[in-house]
């Protein structure tokens, strides 16, 4: 299941709770066409990679998180491990998303 995170406190808690697991964060918005296109694929990754934590953040609902993470465009995918950001890219690129998951998990 993809976790929906609504504020910075919740985001920090998710990073801490994940420990050494990879966290993949999808920063998106309801009005963003490319975000809507990649969303089903992002959600399908949960089944394929059960040891990875998947988080979705709506930048309009959680502006504090988007600002803290320096998100400039949507969709932006950030990858965290051991409470540290290890990778980031922007754009609805399915291949790039799955390659990064495989690389960092």
UniProtKB/Swiss-Prot annotation:
One of its GO terms (biological process) is response to radiation. The active site is at residues 32, 35. Residues 2-105 form the Thioredoxin domain. InterPro entries: Thioredoxin, Thioredoxin-like_sf, Thioredoxin_CS, Thioredoxin_domain. Transmembrane segments: none annotated. This is Thioredoxin. Participates in various redox reactions through the reversible oxidation of its active center dithiol to a disulfide and catalyzes dithiol-disulfide exchange reactions. Plays a role in the reversible S-nitrosylation of cysteine residues in target proteins, and thereby contributes to the response to intracellular nitric oxide. Nitrosylates the active site Cys of CASP3 in response to nitric oxide (NO), and thereby inhibits caspase-3 activity. It holds the Pfam family Thioredoxin. Keywords: Activator, Cytoplasm, Disulfide bond, Electron transport, Nucleus, Redox-active center, S-nitrosylation, Secreted, Transcription, Transcription regulation, Transport. May be nitrosylated on several cysteine residues, depending on the oxidation state. Nitrosylated Cys-73 may serve as donor for nitrosylation of target proteins. Belongs to the thioredoxin family. GO terms for molecular function: protein-disulfide reductase activity. The record marks 26 as: Deprotonates C-terminal active site Cys. One of its GO terms (cellular component) is cytoplasm.
């Amino acid at each position: 299941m993809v976790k929906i995170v609504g504020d910075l406190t919740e985001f920090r808690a998710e990073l801490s709770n994940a420990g050494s697991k990879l966290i993949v964060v999808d920063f998106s918005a309801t009005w963003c066409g490319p975000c809507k296109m990649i969303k089903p694929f992002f959600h399908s990754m949960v089944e394929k990679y059960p040891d990875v934590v998947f988080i979705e953040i709506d930048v309009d609902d959680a502006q504090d998180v988007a600002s803290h993470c320096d998100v400039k465009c949507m969709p932006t995918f950030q990858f965290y491990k051991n409470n540290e950001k290890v990778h980031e890219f922007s754009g609805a690129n399915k291949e790039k998303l799955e390659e990064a998951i495989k690389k960092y998990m």
